[in-house]
Amino acid sequence: MIKLKDLLVERIDYQDTAKMLVKHYGLRSKVKFGRVKGSNEADYDWVKDIINLKRSYPNVKEFIVSVLHEIDHAKMRKKMGARKYEHEYVMAGEEAEQKGGDFHDDNKYEEQAEQWAQDEYRRKWKQKFR
């Protein structure tokens, strides 16, 4: 039987793991759980530099890939600056809509972040988080 204490320990491990990954990539982004907008696995608030994650994930791989995806957004924000990143992201979303796609799902920055997260997980983290 699963005890409440075991569930709390798992959440703390997720929190620590997410913070460790953020630090590993040289970022200062904050990590918060339970504030994800819509049906996304996670989201990144580039104004406040906060990575928001769901409270639970079906498996560790989805959790790590979600964190890595948002880390890629944070890296782009750090590289471009908050204003330029927001401008470029919105322009890419509008371009996707003009082509008949979705602002978020067909955004080139979302596709790039997802590809980087999948590649980075396979290349670097898969063996460490089994």
Regions found by a protein language model. Name each.
Residues 103, 117-130:
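Short helix/loop segments within enzyme catalytic domains
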Residues 68-76:
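Short active-site segment of divalent metal-dependent hydrolases/proteases
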Residues 23-26, 30-52, 57-61:
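Catalytic zinc-binding patch centered on the HExxH motif and its immediate surroundings
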Residues 11-29:
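Zn2+-dependent metallopeptidase catalytic core
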Residues 61-65, 77-111, 115:
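Post-HEXXH active-site segment of zinc metalloproteases
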Residues 4-11:
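Proteolytic processing junctions in secreted/extracellular precursors
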